[in-house]
């Protein structure tokens, strides 16, 4: 079976189980933030930020409205839960997030790891 090829900015349904500790669990949408070339080749990975439908305001979550990228309800990207996953965990492509959303999530990730955001 061929693993799906995820592209930066796509929203996918993914199986994040099994998890440890406070990692985001379950089958849920994720936003791919890795450069598309990262997932190329056998054994490729995708760097993703899990999404939740629970309103979050105190941990750097980024709001994404229903309809964007195929989301069925208002959602929140959780940059603090960033992780690399095997492409085999990707179950179904839902759509593409707006560039502004991808940029906002990427900026939060940069802040988490201490990298200055690019000047726009």
PLM feature spans:
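Conserved functional hotspots at enzyme active or ligand-binding sites that engage polyanionic ligands
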Residues: 1-120
């Amino acid at each position: 079976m061929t693993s799906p090829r995820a592209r930066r900015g796509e929203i996918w349904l993914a199986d994040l189980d099994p998890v440890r500790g406070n990692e985001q669990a379950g089958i849920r949408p994720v936003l791919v933030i890795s450069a598309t070339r990262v997932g190329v080749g056998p054994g490729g990975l995708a760097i993703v930020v899990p999404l939740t439908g629970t309103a979050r305001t105190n941990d750097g979550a980024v709001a994404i409205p229903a309809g964007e990228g195929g989301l069925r309800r208002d959602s929140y990207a959780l940059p603090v839960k960033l992780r690399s996953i095997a492409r085999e965990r990707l179950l179904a492509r839902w759509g593409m997030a707006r560039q502004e959303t991808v940029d906002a999530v990427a900026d939060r990730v940069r802040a988490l790891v201490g990298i200055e955001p690019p000047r726009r």
